[in-house]
Amino acid sequence: MELILKAKDIRVEFKGRDVLDINELEVYDYDRIGLVGANGAGKSTLLRVLLGELTPPGCKMNRLGELAYIPQLDEVTLQEEKDFALVGKLGVEQLNIQTMSGGEETRLKIAQALSAQVHGILADEPTSHLDREGIDFLIGQLKYFTGALLVISHDRYFLDEIVDKIWELKDGKITEYWGNYSDYLRQKEEERKSQAAEYEQFIAERARLERAAEEKRKQARKIEQKAKGSSKKKSTEDGGRLAHQKSIGSKEKKMYNAAKTLEHRIAALGKVEAPEGIRRIRFRQSKALELHNPYPIVGAEINKVFGDKALFENASFQIPLGAKVALTGGNGIGKTTLIQMILNHEEGISISPKAKIGYFAQNGYKYNSNQNVMEFMQKDCDYNISEIRSVLASMGFKQNDIGKSLSVLSGGEIIKLLLAKMLMGRYNILIMDEPSNFLDIPSLEALEILMKEYTGTIVFITHDKRLLENVADVVYEIRDKKINLKH
């Protein structure tokens, strides 16, 4: 293998926190690396360092080949060099950056990178805004790409198909795992089990030593009390009494020394961290929110036209009570329109009178409120503070985040907060438009667990194949102006 990139002593600080603290990284030709980690871990910062856009003091960088960069959406720019055949296959119908959709911009920047003759591609969320067809086409293109690939992505299916090595970025450090994302998950689970066994052994040994030390102290106290009792008695032979007291004192000291030795052994055990457990919550609904209609939402021969474009013609569907229903289909096919038709109770759509619908929109994440996180969650919520904390923790919120004002939260944090609030709200039907967008993988996996355990009905749009497989028990595909039941 030929080395194309080597970096040493990558140290980046931000507001007193070590964002990156990496001794050495190497990228070889034919490497297929997935860079994973929580939002804010420094993944995009690391790509900027490797590209030379950011040069930390003392960092040594050796680039032995040309690199192309697929940036996040808001960084896209038009360039001169393009493979217009590839642009067309990716679905970009025009090149006016001002009027492009998010999906078209994403496809354009991918085409720009693949058009260049480079030794490696660094990609930051390349599947953003792509529909399933676009993602599958991108996977095919990258499989034929002969250079190295280092990619940040929250699409687990994409990572499974493309990468054979995972770099996990956590606490500023990179840990390398061989295999795709599913292989990485299995290795992480083995690590968790090993850590759990080590932690249980540590707790048991510490408890054993603490009991033994306490027993020695207890024995020493008994000897001390015995000595005090015997000193009150008169003895006609002073030498015998003194010898007896010396013997007792020696035993007492021996017991205390044994206790101290055990305490030193406890200290020598060090500290073993408990493994991160999966936080679960038991969702509940009040009697007032119970639905009994087996199909609380039904669409019968609905029609919808935008300008001269018909989205639906005599299309029908029904949403089963308690089901997790996924709406799939290409970009612009009518998925969000169908949700809006349901929310607006448009002609042909019947909704149970007792339905209480919670709605999560793709772009509903702008908040300027000074209300703090816990106050926001507690409003119109029947769950106690402990349960709220549990859900927030599962979505990646730390203890010190609970008191933060909404106005200082990032867009990703607001999205996680809105999803958590909706799941704990006074609803019996949830409608989610691309809930996985902008979530890091840990938060996405936590959301999956919450969605599966939710007791009400969920209708959601997603292009995330793993989310679809893991959560949906009913799947509708919008195609040819119809709403087709897939399973």
Swiss-Prot record:
Keyword tRNA-binding belongs to the record: yes
Compartments in which it is found: Cytoplasm
Induction profile: Expression is probably tightly controlled in vivo. Transcription induced by erythromycin (ERY) and azithromycin (AZI) but not other tested antibiotics. Expression is induced in the presence of ERY by the MsrDL leader peptide, which stalls ribosomes, preventing formation of a Rho-independent terminator structure and allowing translation of this protein. Negatively regulates its own expression. Probably part of a mefAL-mefA-msrDL-msrD operon, where mefAL also encodes a leader peptide that provides upstream control of expression of the whole operon.
Coiled-coil segments on the chain, per record: 185-233
InterPro entries membership: AAA+_ATPase, ABC_tran_Xtn, ABC_transporter-like_ATP-bd, ABCF_EF3_subfamily, P-loop_NTPase
Keywords, sorted A to Z: Antibiotic resistance, ATP-binding, Coiled coil, Cytoplasm, Nucleotide-binding, Protein biosynthesis, Repeat, RNA-binding, Translation regulation, tRNA-binding
Positions of region (Loop): 216-254
Predominant location category: cytoplasm
Family: Belongs to the ABC transporter superfamily. ABCF family.
Record's subunit section: Probably binds to 70S ribosomes, contacting the P-site.
Free-text note regarding domains: Composed of 2 ABC transporter domains joined by a PtIM linker (P-site tRNA-interaction motif). Upon dimerization of the ABC domains, the PtIM forms an extended alpha-helix that interacts with the P-site peptidyl-tRNA and extends into the peptidyl transferase center and/or the peptide exit tunnel in the 70S ribosome. Deletion of the PtIM, or of the loop at its extremity, abolishes antibiotic resistance but does not restore full growth in E.coli.
Record-given protein name: Probable macrolide resistance translation factor MsrD
Organism of this sequence: Streptococcus pneumoniae
